[in-house]
């Protein structure tokens, strides 16, 4: 087994490249066939068969999260020149239902990895010795999956969404993690409040990155974007504020004060984005909030901006909804996101509220001259308790799905991803890991309940647990729905957006 180039990081850097070039390498890849009690573990490995004294030998080790001992599969010796990387797999059984498992690929061989060998999780992850566990706070040091439960299917971790600036030495922590493609090969990512070790101490609001995407994989080569209208600059070492800083907001206090006083700060937080049909421009939806230590975080304005990734410029901006008074915040029906362009000339946006539990949809003509005016919006509702129809009456909105508590909702258009059209991921509980998928061919439904799952994460730490559940149409495949969440415990509690997959 060969630890891929750069894997043997327990030795000096100069020696690493020489050893890796001379011999074996490998890393864990995504498990498959996850049931309540079994899974098949996968890895990529290579061997040069340089010596018979240290033949290429590999196995997997695995354990339920929180358990100190490890189990392992039977070692397999295959001392042949693989002429590059090949896949190896081994099944494991006897697993616990609805349990987070962590796994590593282990081995030794050739002249660069001596016995008893080394173990690695995800590609470029940290190393550990066989029989021992890596740092439990480094979620990329292992390949992670959660087994199916009585009412859930298995989920698997795909890794962190990374930019080239987001390194182990200069780690970036931020939430949100919304994305959409603006071309067949490139996508735009939007993140929330951002900090970086050895970089910006705190950037309020939104930062952004753009780069290539590959279906079924977490992006690892995104480029940080400068503050518009500065032109994109490859190789940036730090994130920068992206959406405009809100002006004129008020604190949610009685009496209110200017936002930025009384332990508060103004922030522009994204609620969704989508490619504008027939262009390589993006529509970005975001709220302007005054984030206060006390009194809540009411959204005081909702904005829609047209963005050109080629020039990193905002082309147009509309503000359809402004709270009155500002400090009271917008009503739930106007807290919209998840833009979806219909083939009927309308732009659809989605939202949710609790108590009563409602997932709502609004529409407006798909024209920048229209979507900036709140008078052009209509909601799917039942005015006068009559039949469902489009209405201007905010108090008449009706839910497009039932039987779920929508702690968060994200919708996107998956047309072209196999037979799928619209898909919605709903976070079904607070601070824990549960979610369910829903699919439809029309924004108003009917929406069909799909698989339920738990993100492959402990969801411990941070005060809010796991949150920011979003689907990614450009990363999903016909049989795997790719989603992301903010993992508060990753990187030793520093926190990071991670991606996962669930069969659909």
Which residue stretches match the model-derived regions?
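Secretory targeting and sorting signals
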Residues: 1-25
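Short, surface-exposed linear motifs at loops/turns and structural transition points
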Residues: 24-149
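Solvent-exposed strand-to-loop "edge" motifs in beta-rich extracellular domains
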Residues: 44-47, 427, 474
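Exposed beta-strand and adjacent loop surfaces of beta-rich binding modules
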Residues: 55-59, 100, 301, 358, ...
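Beta-rich carbohydrate-recognition and catalytic domains
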Residues: 69-74, 122-169, 182-266, 275-329, ...
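Extracellular Ig-like/FN3 beta-sandwich strand-entry sites
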Residues: 98-100, 344, 478
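Beta-propeller and closely related beta-sheet repeat lectin domains
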Residues: 175-178, 240, 247, 255-274, ...
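Short aromatic loop motif centered on NTY/YTY
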Residues: 459-486
